[in-house]
């Protein structure tokens, strides 16, 4: 059952729901209206995020062939067209209701629901109090990666603090913490490549598209520019250590799925045997790499700005 599910449905929630519906029909029959409400919300979500990328990355890269020469041309497409002020309270409450419904199906519980009746089936509903809104749909800018890096890394750090404060929470929050940190690191590597490295737009898009989720590929893409911006042997030594850490993560999770799902696309567990790890140490490991990459981005941005200012000043003489 699992392999056909993955290959037919991937991340598409509507397809997944329709695939499993025959197996949870008894639970659905207990409150079919709640099921139909949830399904309608998934249908509204699907055009926005059927590939599960819209909230992980700031944009996607589209490829088309030049009609005359047949060459591939790369363009950036935003996930959200037009600015929207999202009602975060309504969004969070809808998600909580959906989780409750799905958990009852998973646990074979036959329950009825009332809370969903307070909400419509619009996925990203606008409105609400001013301080309870999130604005999405900004035009692409050079600093577009920054807020996503901050959001993922600070969320991971928050879960890490919960684990340290209460060891009973390790089983619950360890993998989410690792996934959030891993995605933050991927965003940081892509930010350095796309915003600071000395390549043209088409080349940056092409290599970014091919790198997918591989830390090794992303690191190799930025390494030459990073060394060029580094200052002295001390910096190069730090870069060497950072490279070892980054390649360790890549060896464990090159596809960004090990911390995201318990099994791979063939239904096999990522970790077959029990492993005892130091959760605090793992959190600090991720955090230090994240801070290193953020410093790299700031250093390269500062250098590039200085070079641009010098070039502009030099051009004034001619």
PLM features: residue spans?
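Domain-scale activation on soluble regions of proteins
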Residues: 2-318
């Amino acid at each position: 059952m699992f392999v056909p599910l993955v290959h037919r449905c991937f991340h598409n929630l509507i397809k997944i729901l329709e695939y499993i519906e025959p197996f949870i029909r008894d639970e659905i029959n207990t409150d079919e209206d709640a099921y139909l409400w949830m399904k309608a919300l998934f249908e509204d979500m699907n055009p926005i995020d059927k590939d599960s990328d819209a909230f992980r990355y700031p944009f996607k890269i589209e490829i088309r062939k030049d009609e005359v020469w047949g060459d591939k041309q790369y363009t950036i497409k935003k996930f959200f067209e037009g600015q929207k002020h999202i009602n975060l309270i309504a969004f969070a409450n809808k998600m909580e209701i959906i989780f409750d419904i799905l958990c009852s199906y998973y646990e074979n519980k036959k329950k009825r629901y009332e809370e969903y009746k307070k909400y419509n089936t619009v996925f990203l509903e606008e409105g609400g109090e001013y301080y309870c809104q999130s604005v999405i749909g900004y035009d692409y800018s050079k600093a577009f990666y920054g807020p996503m890096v901050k959001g993922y890394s600070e969320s991971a750090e928050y879960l890490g603090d919960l684990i340290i404060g209460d060891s009973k929470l390790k089983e619950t929050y360890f993998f989410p913490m690792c996934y959030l940190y891993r995605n933050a690191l991927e965003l940081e590597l892509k930010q350095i490549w796309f915003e600071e490295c000395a390549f043209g737009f088409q080349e940056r898009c092409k290599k970014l598209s091919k790198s997918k989720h591989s830390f090794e590929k992303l690191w190799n893409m930025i390494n030459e520019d990073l060394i060029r911006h580094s200052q002295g042997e001390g910096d190069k030594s730090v870069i060497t250590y950072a490279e070892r850490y980054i390649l360790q993560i890549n060896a464990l999770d090159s596809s960004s799925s090990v911390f995201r799902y318990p099994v791979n696309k063939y239904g096999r567990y990522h970790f077959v045997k029990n492993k005892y790890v130091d959760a605090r140490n793992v959190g600090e490991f991720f955090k230090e790499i994240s801070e290193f990459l953020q410093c790299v981005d700031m250093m390269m941005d500062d250098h590039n700005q200085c070079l641009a200012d010098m070039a502009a000043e030099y051009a004034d003489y001619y």
